[in-house]
Amino acid sequence: MKYHDLRDFLTLLEQQGELKRITLPVDPHLEITEIADRTLRAGGPALLFENPKGYSMPVLCNLFGTPRRVALGMGQEDVSSLREVGKLLAFLKEPEPPKGFRDLFDKLPQFKQVLNMPTKRLRGAPCQQKIIQGDDVDLNKIPIMTCWPEDAAPLITWGLTVTRGPHKERQNLGIYRQQLIGKNKLIMRWLSHRGGALDFQEWCAAHPGERFPVSVALGADPATILGAVTPVPDTLSEYAFAGLLRGTKTEVVKCVSNDLEVPASAEIVLEGYIEAGEMAPEGPYGDHTGYYNEVDSFPVFTVTHITQREDAIYHSTYTGRPPDEPAVLGVALNEVFVPILQKQFPEIVDFYLPPEGCSYRLAVVTMKKQYAGHAKRVMMGVWSFLRQFMYTKFVIVCDDDVNARDWNDVIWAITTRMDPARDTVLVENTPIDYLDFASPVSGLGSKMGLDATNKWPGETQREWGRPIKKDPQVTARIDAIWDELAIFK
């Protein structure tokens, strides 16, 4: 499935009953969040609020509010098909040369997909049908949502921030929330290790005193949006990955006021700059943990130009205690992670990030254990292999007879196969999510690994328990007479 832009995707969703138009006037201040939250928790459709109170621009919410809609956005029919996306990423992360003619033939589809990686640069684009600049720039005319009662101000949530470091050819796309503080001012909340922040740091070192160009795209096509939240290899741009998902090159256009390239079909683009030293206190905001976060200082983004499509749609979301849209994205992207991990660690059978663990803070791994200490190796591998898991506080490792996605199984393994002193790994002074207020120091805390596998010689000196198994012949005999027994009739 190929979607040229967000509107193509919305047309498909509406045809499949996955989009609901809301014509009743609804306030972007708290009310849209209340409706979107109730709808998402019920597994409902994406919502297009056509008449937000006080605004002439519609608001799109819950676009990726079910795992299936995430899969559709990636060009797949269902969530299970996302494993194929993961296999492609695993191949791109560590490509292997063909071993012979047959292997070359088998790999041809992957090599063919790589041809769609370069971007296609356009001279003009839908996202520049209207250009607003100078004193006419007014972010207050966009229906930016206030999601929770104690939020500091309206908050942009789904903006794709485009940056480029002074020594880099490829651009970085990142999603960072942005607090509205003036008609042309936003606070760019990016953490120091994220791509945009690193580009900014390099720029300040190379061009002291000069303004750092930044652009933010809102309402891009689904492949580009999802490319920005998927674990693409560092050598692959998000635009290139979006081209792989879509099956056609990503169309981009040069910004009006800077040399950055943005998705040509985006609904809205904010162009501007960040100046070194211009900071502002950001927050508090309710976030994906279910709590309001601390106030901290981040750079100020000054918007000099707004370009947009005719009849532009504002794409937004809310974050709160799971389930929310980030948690749903986590469930779907979980399937992408599995093949990537399995390529590096073939012994891994399954990998699961429970949504109630705030998408990434707890992971359950099942594996085919082969030697003493093997579980701890896998544990350390999860923390170090992909940067997405450096904030995972808890890793539980079980044998392959345990269903990683069934808490009944996992808790049984923990309580029967673990000795707390022997099988618990504690690692101190590691990177922790800035939003994790439970850590003793902001951004620095500990991690815990739980080895809930059967223990091998060298790990225990005791005779290990043998799991109870039914006699299959008895089971077959009872199956034959079960209906006759009429126990539940």
Swiss-Prot record:
Record membrane topology = Peripheral membrane protein
Q: Which gene encodes it?
A: ubiD
Q: Which organism is it from?
A: Klebsiella pneumoniae (strain 342)
Keyword Lipid biosynthesis among record annotations:
no
* Keywords from the UniProt entry: Cell membrane, Decarboxylase, Flavoprotein, FMN, Lyase, Manganese, Membrane, Metal-binding, Ubiquinone biosynthesis
Protein's UniProt keywords contain Transport:
no
Q: Which domain of life is it from?
A: Bacteria
Subunit details for this protein?
Homohexamer.
Write out the pathway annotation from the protein's UniProt entry: Cofactor biosynthesis; ubiquinone biosynthesis
Name of the protein described by the UniProt record: 3-octaprenyl-4-hydroxybenzoate carboxy-lyase
Class of enzymatic activity (EC top level)? lyase
